[in-house]
A protein has these predicted regions:
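Long, charged alpha-helical interface segments
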Residues: 160, 165-239
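Non-catalytic positions within long, well-ordered alpha-helices that form the structural scaffold/packing
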Residues: 40, 116-119
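Short phosphate-binding loop-to-helix
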Residues: 70, 74-92, 96-117
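Short, acidic/small-residue loops that bind anionic groups at enzyme active sites
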Residues: 145-162
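N-terminal beta-strand-loop-alpha-helix module at the start
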Residues: 1-82
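Short glycine-rich or small-residue beta-strand-to-loop segments that form or flank ligand, phosphate
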Residues: 97-98, 123-128
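Short Gly/Thr/Asp-enriched flexible loops that form oxyanion-binding sites at enzyme active sites
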Residues: 133-144
Length: 239
């Protein structure tokens, strides 16, 4: 499946430690709700602002909360037609789409769907962790959603990076340092193999109720992890 060459960079309202990289011309930057304030602090103007604005006051846009009602849940952007019918306005001259706060998709996932609809395949989630543990876990699930769609997703913490892989392998250069963990996001991950790390693992099964894959280490050699069947979270030091 082909897609756009650039990255879809989504900045949320969670803990923000600055941008891990500067957006390139071909990248598409989306502010998820009050993530717009994080981008302003970094001096970056997004291509799009998306949110229900229950955490940020915007002139002409009223953010509210309300009781949850039953809504259809769609597995892909093409079927999630609501993203084509969002209320449109502008915030400081930037295109803005307003989401009904009574919804199943959190703002970050809505941004991902829009990026998918735009043709992007690489998603970088910044400001997606913090004091709301439920939001942090939800963003890990967004990584799993992306992996199931055949996309690449990355969630940035202050010192660590998280990504999800599904039925594939990932190689790391010998320059990598620090800790490396592999945790099952699926009920089970079968055929997990880790080579070139401090602890060698061959064709094991990991499950999501036992943190067996915690705290391996890079050792200055090329390393590889693979999973034959399942969605695996990879967490590793990136600074």
């Amino acid at each position: 499946m082909s897609g756009k060459r650039g990255r879809c960079i989504i900045v949320g309202a969670g803990d923000f430690f600055g941008m891990p990289f500067q957006p390139a011309e071909e990248d598409y930057v989306i502010a998820a709700d009050a993530g717009y304030e994080n981008l302003k602090a970094a001096g970056i103007v997004p291509n799009l602002v998306v949110g229900d604005f229950d955490s940020m006051e915007v002139e002409g846009v009223k953010g509210v909360t309300g009781p949850v009602k039953d809504l259809d849940i769609f597995a892909d952007a093409e079927k999630a037609e609501y993203i084509h019918h969002l209320q449109r306005t502008e915030l400081d001259g930037v295109e803005t789409r307003v989401i009904d706060p009574i919804k199943n998709d959190p703002d970050m996932l809505a941004c991902v769907r829009i990026g998918m609809e735009q043709g992007y395949r690489s998603f970088h989630l910044i400001g997606g962790t913090g004091k709301r543990i439920d939001h942090s876990i939800a963003n890990l699930q967004v990584l799993g959603f992306l992996a199931q769609q055949g996309m690449h997703g990355y969630l940035y913490g202050e010192y660590q990076l998280v990504r999800a892989i599904r039925n594939e392998s990932v190689c790391f250069p010998k320059e990598m340092q620090g800790y490396f963990s592999a945790l099952s996001l699926s009920d089970e991950c079968h055929g997990v193999t880790e080579r070139g790390f401090k602890y060698i693992v061959t064709d094991v099964t990991l499950c999501n109720t036992m943190p067996t894959g915690l705290s391996n280490e890079f050792v200055g050699t090329e390393a590889e992890i693979s999973v034959k069947d399942g969605t695996l979270l990879l967490i590793y030091d990136w600074k």
